[in-house]
């Protein structure tokens, strides 16, 4: 995921470079969330209920994807709201509400963007800003790529909310923090009419791909147990991970995505002190500063730093079994939320040649959902040229079309349905939403061998 996203985003950045004329002057640098008082969890956080709005503001910098502000975006708001961390303690998170021109205030999509980072400074509320793109450690081409997904939704006049679901500690891989923040973000959205104009009971859908799909999956799994009052019309998630156990993350060691290992361990450890202690005690002293670098940079920088690195080799050999045991303990605590049922209809879209996931494992996941009586449409793409990133670009069209029916009030069929997706090209209607330089780059990447 990391290296392909990076390659795609870098290609887009080059192709879209002459779009910088939109803002010839460098945007004024603003402090990242770790130094911005707006993001601070207030001392009286326990006086707020989950989903309560604490404060709001307009973004302090222009929202930008490769130098281009989404055409259908009219205004935006950042909202700090109360949520709950993995230890069941009150905390706060930020969401960004993107309001399109001529908005339908009765239709909202919660877009979970892949973050895959272990610091609050990589939350999309910050990395979608032009100012963040001036910081080489905190710039996120992955966020900019996913803003292209947001434009697909905004073009339908739906409102998009984007939660910083990793919370104030950058708790990547901490499922409970993630699910709470997404669901409480929806609660906050329903209470935001005086800020956003969103109606109190809109049709609500969820959308996420890759790391954003994992977050969406957690949210729908926790929905019934944590926020049963919420009505979710449907959830679309694609490019799901097939990792079953926490220690499976080490299977990508010495590979192009090895940077996910320190980010995931540090993100999870932010919610689990015993895991943090094990990491501290297991690291070789000469690698300590190197390993902890993801606490100060986003996925893009970490992916370059750890590209094909032996991350496991940074730990004392005799300490690795104990480290893995603590990792599994923390993960088990994070996954104790398995729901009796998933209430919302699901749209799962997956490429059979996704190099990050075993298609057999995703097939088994979907079949398990069906056996438990969940409502699932499974879109299984069999084109041999659609890897993980390519199908993210190609598959979003079908996902949003499915969400259109759900938000329009059309019932999703009872039970499960499967469809083989033979599409292998970018939807021209989606490509037309972007400036020529960006759409040309997307076509070139999707059509590449």
Task: List where the protein language model places each region.
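Accessory cap/linker subdomain of secreted extracellular hydrolases
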Residues: 30, 238-339
């Amino acid at each position: 995921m990391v290296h392909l996203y990076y390659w795609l985003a870098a290609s887009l950045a080059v192709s879209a470079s002459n779009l910088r004329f939109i803002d010839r002057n460098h945007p004024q640098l603003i402090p990242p969330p770790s130094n911005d008082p707006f993001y601070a969890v207030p001392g009286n956080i326990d006086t707020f209920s989950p989903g309560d709005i604490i404060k709001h503001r307009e973004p302090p910098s222009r929202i930008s994807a490769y130098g281009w502000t989404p055409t259908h975006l009219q205004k935006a708001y950042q909202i700090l709201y109360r949520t709950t961390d993995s230890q069941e303690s009150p905390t706060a998170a930020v969401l960004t509400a993107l309001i399109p021109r001529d908005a339908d205030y009765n239709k909202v999509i919660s877009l979970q963007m892949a973050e895959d980072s272990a610091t609050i400074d990589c939350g999309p509320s910050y990395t979608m800003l032009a100012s963040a793109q001036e910081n080489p450690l905190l710039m996120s081409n992955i966020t900019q790529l996913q803003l292209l997904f947001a434009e697909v939704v905004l073009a339908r006049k739906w409102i998009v909310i984007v939660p910083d679901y990793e919370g104030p500690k950058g708790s990547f891989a901490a499922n409970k923090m993630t699910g709470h923040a997404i669901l409480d973000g929806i609660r906050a959205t329903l209470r935001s009419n005086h800020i956003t104009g969103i109606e109190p009971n809109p049709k609500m859908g969820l959308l996420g791909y890759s790391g954003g799909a994992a977050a969406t999956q957690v949210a729908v799994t926790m929905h019934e147990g944590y926020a049963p009052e919420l009505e979710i019309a449907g959830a679309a998630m694609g490019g799901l991970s097939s990792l079953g156990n926490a220690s499976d993350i080490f299977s990508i060691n010495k590979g192009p995505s090895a940077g996910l290992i320190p980010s995931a361990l540090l993100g999870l450890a932010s919610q689990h002190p015993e895991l943090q202690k094990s990491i501290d005690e297991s690291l070789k002293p000469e690698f300590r500063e190197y390993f902890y670098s993801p606490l100060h940079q986003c996925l893009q920088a970490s992916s370059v730093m750890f590209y094909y690195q032996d991350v496991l080799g940074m730990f004392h050999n005799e300490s690795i079994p104990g480290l893995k045991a603590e990792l599994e303990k923390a993960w088990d605590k994070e996954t104790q939320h398995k729901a009796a049922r998933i209430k919302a209809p699901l749209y799962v879209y997956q490429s059979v040649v996704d190099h990050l996931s075993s298609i057999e494992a995703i097939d088994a996941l979907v079949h398990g959902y069906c056996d438990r009586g969940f409502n699932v449409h499974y879109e299984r793409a069999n084109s041999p040229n659609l890897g993980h990133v390519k199908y993210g670009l190609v598959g979003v069209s079908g996902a949003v079309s499915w969400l259109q029916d759900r938000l329009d009030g059309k019932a999703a069929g009872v039970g499960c349905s499967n469809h083989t997706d033979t599409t292998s090209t970018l939807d021209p209607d989606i490509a037309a939403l972007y400036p020529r330089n960006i759409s040309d780059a997307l076509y070139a990447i999707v059509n590449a061998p």
